[in-house]
């Protein structure tokens, strides 16, 4: 499980792009 999973709950797309 990554952190992104928690933030992704609200905006997976945005969170994924911001992580990159």
From Swiss-Prot:
This is Non-specific lipid-transfer protein. It comes from the Eukaryota. It comes from Citrus sinensis (Sweet orange). Keywords: Allergen, Lipid-binding, Transport. Plant non-specific lipid-transfer proteins transfer phospholipids as well as galactolipids across membranes. May play a role in wax or cutin deposition in the cell walls of expanding epidermal cells and certain secretory tissues. The lineage of its organism: Eukaryota, Viridiplantae, Streptophyta, Embryophyta, Tracheophyta. GO terms for molecular function: lipid binding. Belongs to the plant LTP family.
């Amino acid at each position: 499980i990554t952190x992104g999973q928690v933030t992704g709950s609200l905006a997976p797309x945005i969170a994924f792009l911001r992580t990159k």
